[in-house]
UniProtKB/Swiss-Prot annotation:
<dbReference type="Pfam" id="PF25416">
    <property type="entry name" value="GRHL1_C"/>
</dbReference>
<keyword id="KW-0804">Transcription</keyword>
<keyword id="KW-0238">DNA-binding</keyword>
<comment type="function">
    <text>Functions as a transcriptional activator in a promoter context-dependent manner. Involved in regulation of the alpha-globin gene in erythroid cells. Activation of the alpha-globin promoter in erythroid cells is via synergistic interaction with TFCP2. Functions as a trans-acting factor that regulates the domestic strain CYP2D9 gene through specific association with the regulatory element SDI-A1. Binding to SDI-A1 depends on the type of nucleotide at position 299; binding is abolished by a nucleotide substitution at this position. Modulates the placental expression of CYP11A1.</text>
</comment>
<feature type="modified residue" description="Phosphoserine">
    <location>
        <position position="22"/>
    </location>
</feature>
<feature type="region of interest" description="Disordered">
    <location>
        <begin position="285"/>
        <end position="372"/>
    </location>
</feature>
<feature type="domain" description="Grh/CP2 DB">
    <location>
        <begin position="60"/>
        <end position="296"/>
    </location>
</feature>
<dbReference type="InterPro" id="IPR037600">
    <property type="entry name" value="Ubp1_SAM"/>
</dbReference>
<protein>
    <recommendedName>
        <fullName>Upstream-binding protein 1</fullName>
    </recommendedName>
</protein>
<dbReference type="GO" id="GO:0005654">
    <property type="term" value="C:nucleoplasm"/>
</dbReference>
<dbReference type="InterPro" id="IPR007604">
    <property type="entry name" value="CP2"/>
</dbReference>
<dbReference type="InterPro" id="IPR040167">
    <property type="entry name" value="TF_CP2-like"/>
</dbReference>
<feature type="compositionally biased region" description="Basic and acidic residues">
    <location>
        <begin position="238"/>
        <end position="262"/>
    </location>
</feature>
<keyword id="KW-0805">Transcription regulation</keyword>
<feature type="modified residue" description="Phosphoserine">
    <location>
        <position position="393"/>
    </location>
</feature>
<dbReference type="GO" id="GO:0032897">
    <property type="term" value="P:negative regulation of viral transcription"/>
</dbReference>
<dbReference type="InterPro" id="IPR013761">
    <property type="entry name" value="SAM/pointed_sf"/>
</dbReference>
Length: 540
């Protein structure tokens, strides 16, 4: 036994000696100074890489930083964007911090900057339909705003403004050299934009976005400096506290290995800076939004689902100018249509332009190309949906059901688009049937020619009646429709009379039109006015 052990020791020592000998010569052929790490790092390729990295680090240094005093959720995975829960209507502080290095942006020294804080949608699909979503919210909650600024609690902000047409944005001026805090209140909750199906649906995430601008040569705050945003969800009062507590309890039940996959909860939320790049828009939408600045983050490809993106900021020169209402439609002799062409940006479901578009017979055909479909959407005041339907032909659009359109466009515009596609006209308030007698040169004081009996005129020719549909029960509407149907110059019509008992002429007033019976038949004749300036119309 002892002999066997001694043999093992001899063999082992021999193997170790051979192994050491085989390694002892490695690298000696190259020489001691042949491989120097300092020489390798001094190569030009590494010098260029170091310089590019330093430039990139310098470019990434943001001029400002915004910190919201609200805790982040502990139930967020490591490589995902932070998520913060907010209570509806509660004031939350956003600290506006100057993050510039010494000598950076000297043009801002002693100057004010303008920041616009907005609550926008996180999901890209909802961002494209933001206008329709917010209009629906406004319809359900008239007089309310999605975002407010708690001015008494805010510090260092100047010239605060809100625009009645932009319920999700507030703006103010501030001095980067001074302490500044803006307290915001979010009044919309995440579940308000979730389709109601069976209850218990998860609310959609929002983003709190801050865009900062400096003055241009004209003194207007239009030069963009910085944008940052964070992801939030808004709950009913105290709902955010309960959600935060539930997430914390769930994390406590996880194992230590599982906890390593999640971020810790931080007391504050840092708004993440986004590098912005413009989207190249098609020609149709470019005409519709010449001044829009829709943007995407530079790392759009892989991280869009995780990090979201900054939403396009509103046009600062005109965003807070009160636009005067458009003038009422006017009618002239050169305008044979029954009403004026509506503004393409109007989205009111009760706009008078619906009747005009359908009365003219301009409806989309199944053979319409994608470009013709885009033009039809613009003409019928669906310009907000040109991007959504950019690849739709006429046949594709006509195949959509009413439920499909409501889901895509929302209830109001979805029903309006469905009715436009099906060419459904608005039911008139009053319908009258009118037949024209041969023009008479008889003066107003003379008696007009009596109508023939049995539905025929005095010459024995069968009388052909035209239907007149009145959307407005006023005398001017009667004159306007008669001029349009019978090709009478509207500016030549002085008065409209109705022949009463014993042949007297009664002036047609708004009150008389309102007392017309539906589907009343009239014969009418035209007579020259007393001064031969224009004509009068007499209904019989």
């Amino acid at each position: 036994m002892a002999w066997v052990l001694s043999m093992d020791e001899v063999i082992e020592s021999g193997l170790v000696h051979d192994f050491d000998s085989s390694l002892s010569g490695i690298g000696q052929e190259l020489g001691a100074g042949a491989y120097s790490m300092s020489d390798v790092l001094a190569l030009p390729i590494f010098k260029q890489e170091d310089s590019s990295l330093s430039l990139e680090d310098e470019a990434k240094h943001p001029p400002f930083q915004y910190v919201m005093c609200a805790a982040t959720s502990p139930a967020v995975k490591l490589h995902d964007e932070t998520l913060t829960y907010l209570n509806q209507g509660q004031s939350y502080e956003i600290r506006m911090l100057d993050n510039r290095k010494m000598g950076d942006m000297p043009e801002l020294s002693g100057k004010l900057v303008k920041s616009i804080i907005r609550v926008v949608f996180h999901d890209r699909r909802l961002q494209y339909t933001e206008h329709q979503q917010l209009e629906g919210w406004k319809w359900n909650r008239p007089g309310d705003r999605l975002l407010d600024l708690d001015i008494p609690m805010s510090v260092g902000i100047i010239d605060t403004r809100t625009n009645p047409s932009q319920l999700n944005a507030v703006e103010f001026l501030w001095d980067p050299a001074k302490r500044t805090s803006a307290f915001i209140q979010v009044h919309c909750i995440s579940t308000e934009f979730t389709p109601r199906k069976h209850g218990g649906e998860k609310g959609v995430p929002f983003r709190i976005q801050v865009d900062t601008f400096k003055q241009n040569e004209n003194g207007e705050y239009t030069d963009h400096l910085h944008s940052a945003s964070c992801q939030i969800k808004v709950f009913k009062p105290k709902g955010a506290d309960r959600k935060q507590k539930n997430d914390r309890e769930k994390m406590e039940k996880r194992t230590a290995h599982e906890k390593e996959k999640y971020q810790p909860s931080y007391d504050t939320t840092i708004l993440t800076e986004m590098r912005l790049e413009p989207i190249i828009e098609d020609a149709v939408e470019h005409e519709q939004k010449k001044s829009s600045k829709r943007t995407l983050p530079a790392d759009y490809g892989d991280s869009l689902a995780k990090r979201g993106s900054c939403s396009p900021w509103p046009d600062t020169p005109t965003a807070y100018v009160n636009n005067s209402p458009s003038p009422a439609p006017t009618f002239t002799s050169s305008q044979p249509s029954t009403c004026s062409v509506p503004d393409s940006n109007s989205s009111s479901p009760n706009h008078q332009g619906d009747g005009a578009a359908q009365a003219s017979g301009e409806q989309i055909q199944p053979s319409a190309t994608t470009q013709e479909t885009q033009q039809w959407l613009l003409k019928n005041r669906f310009s907000s949906y040109t991007r959504l339907f950019s690849n739709f032909s006429g046949a594709d659009l006509l195949k959509l059901t009413k439920e499909d359109l409501v889901q895509i466009c929302g209830a109001a515009d979805g029903i309006r688009l469905y009715n436009s596609l099906k060419s459904r006209s608005v039911r008139p308030r009053l319908t009258i049937y009118v037949c024209q007698e041969q023009p008479s040169s008889t003066a107003l004081q003379g008696q007009p020619q009596a109508a023939g009996s049995g539905g025929e005129s005095g010459g024995g020719t069968p009388s052909v009646y035209h239907a007149i549909y009145l959307e407005e029960m006023v005398a001017s509407e009667v004159a306007r429709k008669l001029a349009s149907v019978f090709n009478i110059p509207f500016h030549q019509i002085n008065q409209v009379y109705r022949q009463g008992p014993t042949g007297i002429h009664i002036l047609v007033s708004d009150q008389m039109v309102q007392n017309f019976q539906d589907e009343t038949c009239f014969l009418f004749s035209t007579v020259k006015a007393e001064n031969n300036d224009g004509i009068h119309i007499i209904l019989k």
